[in-house]
Amino acid sequence: MVEELLDDRKFITVPKELADKLKLTSNRLGTSITDFAFDALTQALRIEEMGSSIKEAVDLFQLVSMQRGAGNLSINRGNFKEIIEQLNEEKRLELSDIWEESGRWYGAYLKAKLHDGDLFNFLKRDLKFSWNLDEVDIYQRDLLVIIRCVSFGMSMELTDLLVSFISGLMDELNFSETDRDILRGLVIIKFLGKLN
C-alpha cells in the first residue's frame, strides 16, 4: 500500500541549508514544504515554457517592484514624443530640468534600496526596461563609470531627456560627468566618482 502511494512521487535531494530555508518559508506562509516546492517548481517550468528563465523573472519582479515603489509611470514613447514636440524651447528646457531632478530623486531612492554592488547591475536593467532601450552597457573601473545607451527609434528630444535623467541620477550617486557623446538614440557619458 505504501509503495502504491509513492508510485507517483519522486524524491529530489537538495542541500540541507536550502531545505531548512524552504521549511522556514513554508511555515511562514502557512503551507507544507511539499506544496511550497510544488508551486515553486511549477512556476519555474511555466517561466521556462515562456522562453525565459527564473533569474529573468526574479530580476523583472525586482525591477517592477522598484518602479512601482518609486511611483514611476509607463507611457507610450510615441505619445510622449508628440507631447514633447508641441513644447516651445523654454518649456523643453524646463522639462529637461524636471527630468534631471527626477534622476536625482531616483538615484537617492536606489541608494536607499540597493546595495552598492547591485546598483549598476540593476541600473542597467532598469534603464533598458523603463526607457525602452535596445542596448545598455555600464562599465565601471575604479572611479570611472561609462554609460552607453542605444535606442534605434528614439527621437532627439527623448534622447536629451534620457541624458538629463542619467546626469541627475549619477550626480546623486556622487559622480561628476567628464565627457559625453550624444546623437539621436545614442548616448555615451563618462563619469568620475567624487572623492569625499
What are these regions (language model features)?
Residues M1-K16, K23-N27:
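Short Lys/Arg-rich basic patches
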Residues L73-R148:
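An N-terminal amphipathic alpha-helical segment
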